[in-house]
């Protein structure tokens, strides 16, 4: 054998990361456009860092290099500008393929629809990640990837999902909207198998009880049930999952429709018989499958078997069960192999340590910003250019963040707040528990408490805002008082137009009176 011979073909890369960046309707008015300029959800800041940077960093740390980033057409230019700036410095190892699709905030497109549309670009096993996921240091992506690598071959798993402890979070005004409550899930702890995810249809049909099939319990007699966990929307999937999606054109939501359906493949024989062979045959050519066959740890056995006919085992009708929690143990089914027959398992990693979140609603966006304030200590800038912008008589607490090129005026108080770049904070202002985006202006004597201000917001002198949100470009009048409101440019513009109209009518009336005299 010639060891000096250079191989003619490179080993293909194992995974493609598919990062989804949607409109962020639950984050309005922060994501509402500023005139002709869009405000992409992916670029909203968390601790003065665009939220999309968190999953991109996570990917790079895991060794993933190929990224398919999908966003609405209206956001493509803004996101392209951002990743072009960072790709050569912050993320040199990532090869980001930015693709856009036609969508509007009024007609949002679900994850399943997007994946079907870009199926031709997903040619290998893939990792699905939302742009709003903020992972903790205690959860490396390699935890999910390694679980998938082993179980997809040795146990026939088709995907691995990740769920995390639902944060309590702080209270937010009802006007901000409340995040959706976590959904009940049933899983097997010992094997790490997700068995059931409640759907909106399940809740509408019977909101008091779960309906589970006896065939589930015959495979996994000891299961755990909880509603304490939230879906991260991070999935490591076989390429064959895309093929199944193309056979299910009516599925739109991955979490609410497709994932619960995938769980049923594990214990419903008719579904296993119909889809199992396609999934299995597609997996045999995967690079990691070939490697595992030559591994010293590989036994040559798998739990992946398919029934000879869909009638080998008749699916039992759903049974109503009360909430339960017990140590789990799968059943020995085939020659001592642990796992259900015709596995097609949906693996699950349930993470319970460290602050984790999805910034897909206003409450979580605020809480994640506040969390990062506890991880840092503010000090005066070391460079003279930024240092002179902070008045020595201002008071800035250690648990605050001030962005570059931001000016803070005399006797201004900043406490437990994040202030972005290129902002101007006037004299004697008071800012407590707020998140202020870039390029905002807070004039003298203004008071802000528990607010999130969008890009280019201007707050007039001595105005008072309590737990308010502002759309990018909004202007608060001097001495204006607002509490628990979403302040949008359309409302402000309408009010300004009404005032101008009243002034115009008054002028016309005065002119008519003068003419009569």
Regions found by a protein language model. Give the residues of each.
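Flexible, disordered linker segments and immediate boundary regions flanking tandem C2H2 zinc-finger modules
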Residues: 142, 274, 377-383
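C-terminal, non-catalytic macromolecule-binding modules
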Residues: 370-378
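A structural motif detector for beta-strand N-caps
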Residues: 382, 386-395, 400, 406-408, ...
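C-terminal segments of enzyme domains that contribute to small-molecule binding surfaces
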Residues: 464, 472-517
């Amino acid at each position: 054998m010639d060891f000096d011979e250079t191989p003619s073909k490179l080993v293909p890369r194992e995974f493609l990361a598919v990062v989804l960046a949607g409109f962020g309707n639950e984050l309005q008015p922060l994501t509402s456009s500023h005139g002709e300029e869009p405000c992409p959800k992916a670029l909203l800041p968390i601790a003065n860092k665009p939220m999309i940077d968190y999953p991109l960093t996570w990917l790079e740390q895991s060794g993933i290099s190929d990224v398919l980033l999908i966003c609405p057409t209206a956001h493509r230019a803004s996101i392209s500008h951002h990743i072009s700036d960072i790709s050569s410095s912050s993320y040199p190892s990532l090869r980001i393929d930015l693709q856009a699709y036609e969508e509007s905030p009024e007609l949002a497109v679900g994850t399943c629809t997007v994946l079907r549309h870009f199926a031709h670009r997903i040619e290998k096993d893939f990792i699905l990640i939302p742009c709003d996921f903020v992972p903790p240091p205690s959860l490396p992506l390699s935890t999910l990837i390694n679980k998938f690598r082993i179980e997809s071959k040795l146990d026939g798993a088709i995907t691995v999902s990740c769920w995390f402890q639902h944060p309590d979070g702080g209270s937010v005004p009802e006007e901000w909207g409340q995040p959706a409550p976590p959904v009940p899930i049933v899983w097997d702890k010992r094997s790490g198998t997700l068995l059931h995810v409640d759907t909106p249809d399940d809740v509408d049909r019977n909101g008091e009880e779960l309906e589970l099939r006896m065939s589930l319990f015959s495979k996994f007699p000891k299961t755990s049930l909880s509603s304490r966990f939230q879906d991260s929307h991070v999935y490591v999937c076989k390429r064959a999952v895309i093929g199944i999606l193309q056979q299910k054109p009516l599925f739109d939501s991955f979490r609410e429709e497709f994932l619960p359906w995938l769980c049923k493949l594990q214990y419903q024989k008719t579904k296993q018989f119909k889809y199992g062979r396609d999934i299995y045959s597609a997996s045999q050519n995967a690079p990691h499958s070939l490697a595992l066959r030559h591994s010293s740890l590989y036994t040559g056995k798998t739990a992946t078997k398919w029934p000879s006919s869909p009638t080998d085992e008749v699916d039992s009708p759903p049974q109503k069960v009360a909430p339960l929690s017990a140590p789990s143990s799968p059943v020995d089914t085939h020659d001592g192999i642990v796992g259900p027959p015709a596995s097609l398992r949906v693996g699950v990693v349930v993470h319970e340590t460290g602050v984790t979140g999805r910034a897909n609603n206003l409450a979580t966006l605020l809480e994640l910003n506040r969390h990062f304030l506890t991880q840092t200590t503010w000090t005066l800038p070391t460079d003279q250019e930024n240092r002179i912008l902070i008045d020595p008589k201002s008071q800035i607490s250690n648990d605050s963040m001030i962005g570059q090129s931001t000016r803070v005026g005399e006797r201004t108080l900043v406490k437990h707040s994040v202030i972005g770049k290129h902002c101007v904070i006037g004299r004697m202002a008071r800012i407590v528990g707020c998140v202020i985006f870039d390029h905002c202006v807070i004039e003298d004597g203004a008071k802000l408490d528990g607010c999130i201000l969008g890009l280019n917001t201007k707050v007039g002198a001595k105005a008072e805002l309590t737990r308010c949100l502002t759309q990018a470009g909004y202007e608060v009048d001097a001495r204006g008082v607002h509490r628990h409101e979403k302040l949008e440019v359309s409302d402000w513009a309408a009010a300004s137009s009404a005032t101008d109209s009243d002034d115009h009518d008054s002028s016309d009336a005065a002119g008519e009176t003068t003419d009569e005299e």
